[in-house]
Amino acid sequence: MPDSLPPGVRRRVVELASERLGVMAAEKVPPSLRKIARFAPARRAALGATPIAAALETDEAFRDEVVELVRAAFPDVVDALDEGASLPAADPSDVAAIAYLLRSEGWVDRVEQARGVE
């Protein structure tokens, strides 16, 4: 994950990944995250933020797992991002985090928009 993600976006990305990590089948959990996966959710996101962020950047299968959660939890946001639509009522950090995970077209612009409101 680029260090340039705004703090709110990075925090939301890690929260979403942490949530998914807690329910993943053990064999699908990246080796670097197996110990962290056993933590309680809040502790997992707080203490595991750096390795979770690194895994999202380097492990496409793990990011795909997180994207599966995002698609199920935020279908309207995902559809809007897929269509390139504006989301004026949505939290810019949430939108940027979801766009980053999906790597949808224009995700970098969404991150920059979130940076402007933090």
Model-based region annotation:
Residues 1-111:
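N-terminal, leucine/charged-rich tether regions that mediate assembly and partner docking
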Residues 110-118:
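Acidic, low-complexity intrinsically disordered segments
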